[in-house]
Swiss-Prot record:
Subunit structure: The RNAP catalytic core consists of 2 alpha, 1 beta, 1 beta' and 1 omega subunit. When a sigma factor is associated with the core the holoenzyme is formed, which can initiate transcription.
E.C. code: 2.7.7.6
Protein name: DNA-directed RNA polymerase subunit omega
Organism this protein belongs to: Clostridium botulinum (strain Hall / ATCC 3502 / NCTC 13319 / Type A)
Taxonomic lineage from the root: Bacteria, Bacillati, Bacillota, Clostridia, Eubacteriales
Highest taxon of the lineage: Bacteria
Enzyme category, top tier: transferase
Catalytic activity: RNA(n) + a ribonucleoside 5'-triphosphate = RNA(n+1) + diphosphate
Any one GO BP annotation for this protein: DNA-templated transcription initiation
Its job: Promotes RNA polymerase assembly. Latches the N- and C-terminal regions of the beta' subunit thereby facilitating its interaction with the beta and alpha subunits.
A single GO cellular-component term on record: cytosolic DNA-directed RNA polymerase complex
MF GO annotations: bacterial-type RNA polymerase core enzyme binding; DNA binding; DNA-directed RNA polymerase activity
Amino acid sequence: MSNSMINPSIVNLLEKVDDRYSLVTITSKRSRQLIDGAKPLVDIDSTKPVTVAINEIHEGKITYKTVKEGIK
């Protein structure tokens, strides 16, 4: 049994994104889309938007662009 309460683990999720900040940002934006009525891209038992978003990220269903420029 895993010590992690989150499945997939943070370590596995960080393999899919650049860093923790990106993971939080992508998860929150996708969760908001799901709350607003977007269809889930994965088939899981949970209906919780954050859980669905995390699983979508883990399965590689979510893409994102990194903006290199800061606010000027």
